């Protein structure tokens, strides 16, 4: 029999992080449940859909050790709606009794023995990295942008983690755009594709942490902090050799304020909706002007201009949504936008000395 006391705030937060992983697979109804189990002086709260398992640990006053599984959404919504304060949890047979002030309930559960075994990674044998949480969250945002939603090309639905020239890189592509982030210096060798959905879970689960440990074995990845652990299967397959898509030089290089580039792009996009989002970017070296033109056959047309440093004249047509999305996630005051003619990939980087983020957008045929 388990009998513990926890705070409503910590329990609600942990349950809300776990509940979305609970699956609705009819063949395994127990995956709708989450696992509660005492673990030393803490309460373990875990959920899995057999592809990913997430575990949260919260401090608890433990009278009796034990475990149970209970419906994820019901218990999460119930605890979330309770007032702040202590919550008493007690198991009796296959039922969880919950008491908090004037509120009490009994939730039917299933014995923990029927719950799938939570996956683990052998830390001694794993490839390990220690990463600043904020740096990781930023890298996830910047690369997940280019992840494909096409499940028939599974390797493109994740983010590729790999080492190159002494650094750990993250990369993603959907065939129309490519994002690459240099994360940390490291000589540890890894080549693994992590599902984008796993990285989304990691991002929302580590808000209060400063460092996170990432461990890889041949088929799994584990993200671990003191109070959280997420273990996920890797995507099987070989990621494309994307580096050949990144141009080594550029005929036309444009240095422009990000705010100016964003404004003219968003205005042009208003008139590009009828034409599949296509906008034409023209660079004039003589006038130091970047102009963006778009046409809507029913509404009219638009040309917007911004001052920029331009190395050579050039013109290219892009999807306005792709350009707007990448400009929204770059922090720099100035952007370097470069290309080699109408049909070559366009490169977007921050205008800083050693930029660690590269974004590629393939042009549209104008």
Segment roles from a protein language model:
Residues 1-366:
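Structural preference for solvent-exposed beta-strand-turn elements
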